[in-house]
């Protein structure tokens, strides 16, 4: 009788390695550029300038910026996701979480968030906040599954130079 062997796939949530930081920063910056273009109607050039400025302001010492933490999610020995959060006074802010596109929709995002929330709980954190793009319905639904609730809305208005008076 033949038996079918199944390969056991292993997922690991771990601190990001130094050599992964630049790759993550490029991926994250590109995502932020797309977000700024879509949700703020920035030109690509303006979005790239803003994204670069934001990263330099938020992470002046890169991976060594105090109170900022970086994680990698591995699946079957391959890095498939990255996460950046800050933790201060037992309150966390999730600045970025991403899964490589070909690994989305397979339950890994759920496992990644669960591992992150368990880490925070084990460190005594009492809350976590985040911002999500309004057009990212998949992420909104996932966060709601974990009990996140909407606490406000970011709003913006582009002022056009040719408008001298707003009525």
Question: What do these predicted ranges mean?
Answer:
Residues 78, 123, 149:
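Structured loop/turn residues at beta-strand edges in well-structured enzyme cores
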């Amino acid at each position: 009788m033949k038996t079918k062997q199944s390969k056991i796939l292993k997922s690991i949530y771990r601190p990001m390695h130094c050599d992964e930081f630049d790759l993550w920063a490029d991926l994250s910056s590109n995502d932020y550029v797309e977000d700024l273009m879509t949700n703020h109607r920035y030109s690509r050039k303006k979005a790239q300038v803003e994204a670069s400025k934001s990263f330099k302001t938020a992470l002046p010492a890169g991976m060594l910026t105090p109170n900022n933490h970086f994680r990698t999610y591995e699946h079957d020995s391959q890095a498939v996701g990255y996460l950046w959060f800050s933790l201060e006074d037992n309150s966390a802010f999730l600045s970025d979480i991403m899964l490589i596109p070909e690994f989305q929709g397979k339950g890994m995002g759920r496992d990644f968030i669960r591992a992150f929330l368990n880490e925070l709980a084990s460190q005594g954190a009492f809350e976590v906040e985040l911002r999500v793009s309004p057009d990212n319905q998949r992420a909104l639904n996932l966060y709601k599954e974990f009990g996140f609730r909407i606490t406000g809305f970011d709003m913006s208005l582009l002022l056009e130079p040719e408008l001298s008076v707003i009525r």
